[in-house]
Amino acid sequence: MKKPLGTIAHTRSGDKGDTANIGVIVFKPEHYPIILREVTTARVKAFFGDLVKGEVERFELPNLGAINLLLHESLGGGGTVSLRVDAQGKTFGAALLRMEIEVD
């Protein structure tokens, strides 16, 4: 059954230069394998489309039931030079919660 990622996880996001950072944390430990399967670098890059010019990296944090995503070249140069409304990447996490995933 397809559901938004936000039904099983919450996020925090921010910036480091021109890279957005998104932490995805499951509400329940049994949902961790679902985010590992469904929240892939390819799917995240496709979800954000042209907003992410560089690669997407994923780091797994099983003891926390979380993953950390780095979206390179996604902030228009970074907070001090970007003309984007969200130059610090604070809305990337909220946006990702809308991505449809397959939930067992």
Task: State where each predicted segment sits.
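Metallocofactor- and cofactor-centric catalytic cores in central/energy metabolism, strongly enriched
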Residues: 2-104
